[in-house]
Amino acid sequence: DLLHKNNIQINVDDARHYNAMTGLMNMIEPDVIIHLAAVSHANKANKDPHTTFDHSLRTLENTLDIARSFNSHLIYFSSSMVYGHFKESNVTEETICNPLGMYGSLKYAAELIVKAYNQVFDLPYTIIRPSALYGERCVSRRVGQIFIENAVQGKDITVQGDGNDKLDFTYIEDLIQGINLVIENKNSLNQTFNLTFGE
């Protein structure tokens, strides 16, 4: 409803279907493509690697080929999960990636493929690494949502591990503002950004 109210055209198709995506993009001729198609949760990725590969890398392959044909600025949504466990108290874009599990590993592999398209085809890109999104319309059952639901329902809040792990939460409106800045600023081309709250 929100998209319709703002006159944003919605086309529903499977991003794994190359011909359907090509036909759609030929109608739009995009200057910018924001690639969001993927399995969106680490637990799901670890439970079903086959589907994760298909939904993450097949969709990216199609998107890259289409972006290349229009020389579109590709904005690829990666994840802070590419860092794995890190020793530093703060993570920067220069922190060495050492992903754990299927989700982080596939996100990092996809980043390398995006960069390869830039090297071989001069495709402009920006990689965004958000962390722990929360906010309106979030239905992915991430840790923040689970904690709030349990608190409201009077249930226990369980913290995994020894309690020393840190997670930088990102409010959805802040992420949207960051995306807009990436689109509007040519200095964002061929760069990687951690889009998080920063604490």
Describe the role of every protein-language-model region.
Residues A42-T59, V91-P99:
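Short alpha-helical oligomerization interface
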Residues E29, H35, E61-M102:
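Conserved Rossmann-fold NAD(P)-dependent oxidoreductase catalytic core, especially the SDR/UDP-sugar
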Residues T51-F53, T95, L100-E111, R141-Q145, ...:
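Short-chain dehydrogenase/reductase
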Residues A38, D48, F53-L60, L64-A67, ...:
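Short alpha-helix in the Rossmann-fold core of NAD(P)-dependent oxidoreductases
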Residues H85-F86, N98-T126, A151-Q153:
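Active-site Tyr-X1-5-Lys
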Residues D1-V32:
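N-terminal Rossmann/SDR dinucleotide-binding element
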Residues Y108, L133-I146, K155, Q160, ...:
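Glycine/proline-rich active-site loop of Rossmann-fold NAD(P)-dependent oxidoreductases
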Residues Y83-G84, N98-M102, T126-V143:
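Flexible, glycine-rich beta-alpha linker
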